[in-house]
Amino acid sequence: AGSNDTDHGCALAAKSAACGADALLLVTPYYNKTSQSGLVAHFTAMAEAGGIPVILYNVPSRTGLNIAPETARELSRHPLINGIKEASGNIGQVAKIAALCGDELNIYSGNDDQVVPLLSLGGKGVISVVSNVKPELVHNCCKAWFDGDTAKARELQLEMLPLCDALFCEVNPIPVKYLSLIHISEPTRLR
């Protein structure tokens, strides 16, 4: 659920929960740039409206608004906010979030080209675009890391890079959908 209107976002969160969603992925409000305290109020209201676990989605390149590490720390104290899809592309920021939040906030990579660097900072996985085309590659990369085979994880991360470039030559999800149309990947569908 995502909205730049908190009331509308709360309605979407509640409806998602009522329809059986297990969790909410909540993107930062786009277009209307709020303050960091405004982000706390926005995400808190949406989490409470949904009443189910929340993963924050930080993608400032798309929304124009970044969740600061200190804001992530404050939000991690909410009992329903237990994760962040970190797609800022700033590994230093990810390190600071990890240092501030510890085990209170599960960090997931939102950038397929930074899976292993993020895992090395204590990340729990990736919410991936590449996995729509090569799910086994992304799975095996994460599995290798968690199995302690960092050399294999690094090798698979590097193998992903050309695919990352191809999948982001246009705005997502255009390349993924195109690949499904020409039968290079499984057809995309709602999950």
Where are these regions (language model features)?
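Active-site beta->alpha loop and helix N-cap motifs at the rims of alpha/beta catalytic domains
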Residues: 1-64
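Catalytic alpha/beta core domains of metabolic enzymes, predominantly
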Residues: 62-168
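C-terminal substrate-binding/catalytic lobe of Rossmann-fold NAD(P)-dependent oxidoreductases
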Residues: 169-174, 180
